[in-house]
Regions:
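Generic structural signal for small/hydrophobic residues in well-ordered secondary structure
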Residues: 78-79, 109, 113, 168, ...
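Active-site metal-binding loops of divalent metal-dependent hydrolases
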Residues: 80, 126, 216, 253-254, ...
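Short catalytic/ligand-binding loop motif for oxyanion handling, primarily in non-cytosolic enzymes
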Residues: 83-86, 129-133, 151-155, 164, ...
Length: 371
């Protein structure tokens, strides 16, 4: 989404989530039951199938990593649809208005995240960060957030402040080493898009991992295509500035189909070498869509969201599998968002294995004293 800078900013309606009180000390099952309680009279979340990585990747994993006790983790990537945009800008003509109510949507978003039990959560269009920080915090996550410098949300009625990118990690699995944020630049000029980068240490293996999440410029046209590509170049420079040879994941809503230049920029670079997790589990092909919506100007479906990972050398991650996107027949004629799907984008859920640390051989020096 672009900026509505010709309009005056509207004071945010903060405090809309103050009455949400997540239960302390609940097990994951009990907590999920609490999340689902307000949704009891609504259709459930959409069914999805898990797709394992092809046999060669699994064979490589078993021979190279599993024997060394490689650590595995799950990552969830999702543009959750900013509430202000969903209700006052995006014109989802086939979505029941009640399905866009925040009182319903917030619990459906939480349900989607917690059902898949990710170790790392990367979100875009987050305009209720404090709620997710509080709710996910009760379940053992810590998070970070960077807002867009000129979010379109702040020009819309009933907004809750600017939207931006958020990243959460499970503290029983990872420790935060460092974090950085950046306003992406286009030809050395700051844009309205941001990136959030964290380095995490996996507690069991002590292996470090860099994760970067972003949301690139939207809309069609030759100029916008070029702007996205420049943002992609800046993104890679930002990553290499802080990665220091670690395994890395770059994920987000890139607002670009695989045929766009920015996709090639991200996946054909050698600094670092990145592959798409979903293409890996789909025999080299990206899914046909990661968003499917009907607005006032018509129906559109595109593949815009990606999870990219380092695929070479000592920083190579192993993809174990990923969750397929919802099928057309399950989406129904209204597509997304809906009562079952709280966003116009679908979450991407991927399982990875970290490469083991290469430690120097242990040498015992002979003691020649007294000889």
């Amino acid at each position: 989404m672009g900026s509505f800078t010709s309009r005056p900013q509207i004071t945010s309606c903060s405090g809309t989530d103050d009455k949400v009180e997540p239960p302390e000390g609940a097990s994951p099952e009990q907590f999920l039951e609490w999340v689902r309680r307000p949704l009891a009279d609504l259709p459930g979340i959409l069914p999805r199938e898990y797709r394992r990585a092809p046999a060669p990747s699994l064979a490589t994993l078993h021979t190279a990593s599993a024997a060394a006790g490689a650590a595995t983790f799950r990552l969830l990537q999702w543009n959750i649809l900013a509430q202000a945009l969903g209700t006052h800008a995006d014109n989802f003509v086939k979505c029941p208005p009640e399905a866009l109510h925040w009182s319903t949507r917030r619990f459906r978003i939480m349900e989607e995240i917690l059902t898949h039990s990710p170790d790392i959560v990367c979100l875009q269009e987050v305009d209720h960060y404090s709620l997710f920080e509080r709710v996910l915090g009760v379940q053992g996550y810590e998070g970070l957030f960077i807002p867009k410098p000129d979010s379109p949300c702040i020009y819309l009625p009933e907004n809750s402040g600017p939207d931006g990118c958020a990243l959460f990690y499970r503290t029983s699995k990872f420790q935060l080493v460092e974090h950085h944020s950046r306003i992406l630049e286009i030809w050395r000029v700051q844009s309205n898009q941001v990136a959030l980068l964290v380095t995490l240490r996996e507690l069991q293996s002590q292996r470090e991992l860099t994760v970067l999440t972003t949301h690139l410029k939207a809309r069609k046209g030759a100029l916008l295509t070029s702007l996205r590509n420049e943002q992609g170049k800046d993104l890679l420079q930002f990553l290499e500035q802080h990665r220091h040879g670690r395994p890395a994941i770059v994920c987000g809503d890139m607002n670009a189909e695989p045929v766009e230049p920015v996709y090639a920029t991200l996946t054909q670079s050698h600094q670092p070498s990145l592959s798409s997790a979903y293409a890996t589990v789909n025999d080299g092909h990206e899914p046909p869509y990661s968003t499917w919506k009907i607005r006032g100007d018509g129906e559109t479906k595109h593949n815009l969201d990606y999870v990219l990972y380092t695929d070479e050398g000592s920083s190579a991650l192993q993809v174990l599998g990923a969750l397929d996107h919802p099928k057309e027949e399950d989406l129904g004629p209204g597509r997304a968002p809906s009562f079952s799907c709280p966003s116009d984008h679908f979450s991407l859920v991927c399982d990875f294995a970290l490469p083991p640390l290469k430690r120097p051989p242990f040498h015992v020096e002979e003691d020649h004293r007294g000889r």
